[in-house]
Amino acid sequence: MDWGLKNRLAKIISPADNRALMLAVDHGYFLGPTEKLEDLKKTIAPLAKHCDSLMITRGALRTSVNPDYPVPVVLRVSGGTSIIGEDLSQEDITVSIKDALRLNVA
């Protein structure tokens, strides 16, 4: 494992106890707004101090998270055109490496 990967993982997984608490708010991607997650900005703000990282989509990050958010962001970079059918694995990469770098995500 190279230095950059170790550095990013150390920001997500606490080196003190080797554990992580990730707040995953990428659920709306599959089924639309989830109850209590309709206003992500209001939902995320009070929980930030309790989390080691935040998992979120690019659009939700841009619209619902302040740039001074205190914890690392793990970006969901996959997406699909439909949730119809049994198989939800019909996804592609939807975020470029350049976009991920611009967003400074882990």
Segments (PLM) and residue ranges:
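N-terminal basic/disordered segments at the start of proteins
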Residues: 1-15
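Alpha/beta enzyme core
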Residues: 15-106
